[in-house]
Amino acid sequence: MSKEEKLAIAAATDGACSGNPGPGGWGALIRFQDGSEIEFGGNSPETTNNRMELQAALFILEKLKNIEFAPSLTIKTDSKYLIDGMEKWMPNWKKKGWKTASGKPVLNQDLWKALDHPELPKIKLQYVKGHSGEKDNDRVDAIAVAFSKGRKIQLKDFANN
């Protein structure tokens, strides 16, 4: 798929963990102007819900590097940890050598640093309440939970839209 083929207009991410730590999964989707969607998911055998939230966001940003997207595109997430980390905490962590206000090393530093990579697109995050009936959030949650539990789930791609 080239940048010229489709215009991305919406995105959503979620992470889930069975036990915390425990087996985890993440889900993500991108919706295009023509109504088509692509969905993604992944898992980790031993992780936390926060790591899965960050992994989902990192994956979708990596995908959006190579896709044309509308300037109004936001990434919907139910993770205040992700939003606060990206929008409030990260500048101070960087100033303090990736330490928290209390001087402790930032948790999940590898993923935060990857999310801060200058080649990733800067896209606004939009908070949505989890399990509230918001269609995209419910879908990426279902993907994340399925991957965390090792269940099969049909993901949409351009062939089955």
Swiss-Prot record:
It comes from the Bacteria. Mg(2+) 2 binds at residues 14, 141. Its cofactor is Mg(2+). It catalyses: Endonucleolytic cleavage to 5'-phosphomonoester. InterPro entries: RNase_H, RNaseH-like_sf, RNaseH_domain, RNaseH_sf, RNaseHI. GO terms for molecular function: magnesium ion binding; nucleic acid binding; RNA-DNA hybrid ribonuclease activity. The keyword Lipid biosynthesis does not apply. GO terms for cellular component: cytoplasm. Mg(2+) 1 binds at residues 14, 53, 78. It is found in: Cytoplasm. One of its GO terms (biological process) is DNA replication, removal of RNA primer. Monomer. Endonuclease that specifically degrades the RNA of RNA-DNA hybrids. This is Ribonuclease H. It comes from Prochlorococcus marinus (strain NATL1A).
